[in-house]
Amino acid sequence: MSVILGSGEHRYRVVENWGKLPDGWSFKDVAAVGVDSKDQVYVFNRGEHPVIVFDRDGNFLRSWGEGVFQRAHGLDIDKNDVLYLTDDGDHTVRRCTSAGKVELTIGIPGKPAPFMSGEPFHRCTHTALSPKDEIYVSDGYGNARVHKFSPAGKLIMSWGESGSEPGQFNIAHNIATDDAGWVYVADRENHRVQVFDGNGKYETQWNNLHRPCGLYCCRGKSPTFVIGELGPGMPVNLKAPNLGPRLSIVDAQGKLLARLGGKDGPGLEPGKFLAPHGLAIDSKGDIYVGEVSYTNWKTSFPDTPQPKTIRSLQKLARVP
């Protein structure tokens, strides 16, 4: 019997064992997922084949990026099926064709900016595009910053600093934009999503979240958002209920519409998550969830030996 998550208009069926890899291949952590105009699913992962492409039924199509990336972290795909891949291991953002040709590199591979200097980049995390194809980059692990670049990769401006006040960040982990040009930043360890105009002016924030990690905007005049939330990261609250890991669906004002999973902690059973890190949605409304399961295992299950293979990619099919 299929497992159904969510409620009301936001119900999803768990598609078990989605994504058929060639023999001997593995994802390791799936840091990010993207879907192009043909509903091809790009899986940006930390295995030997960094970009693996499937059709929406999970059939393997191709791979690329071998020898290019150091540590996969973020992926965004534009309307022309151009990919923006964020590598926090070598402090770069690469713009690539759907076949894997690198067209632009922002940042100097292997040369981070000084820690918390505010200069790009020190372990950048994700990208998003403005309606004018300007490139926003969340720079969240070694900085507390959002950078705005021209389509050619020239720095226009930056904003943010370490802290918990509006406009400050404690791990700017993910970033998204909508068709009106608003910028949404998953401020992970401040447990919120902050909303800015296209030039970094603070507008509002969404709370009622727990360590928001993945962030996806379902575009349109009244967009909804899917937010991947990590579970507790400390031994004292590790087994506390209702804190994730989970997905939350909210409207453009941050009002909660549905929650998927997360009531009784992490797990490998259908309907549970380990560490939802990257999100994408196809033309049918199905959700693809990339999880950093290997990285998270010891946090979630400190007393359980790590399995050799751990699920790190899920598909949730929307229920009509």
Question: Where are each of the predicted segments found?
Answer:
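Eukaryotic scaffold repeat domains enriched in small/polar residues
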Residues: 1-320
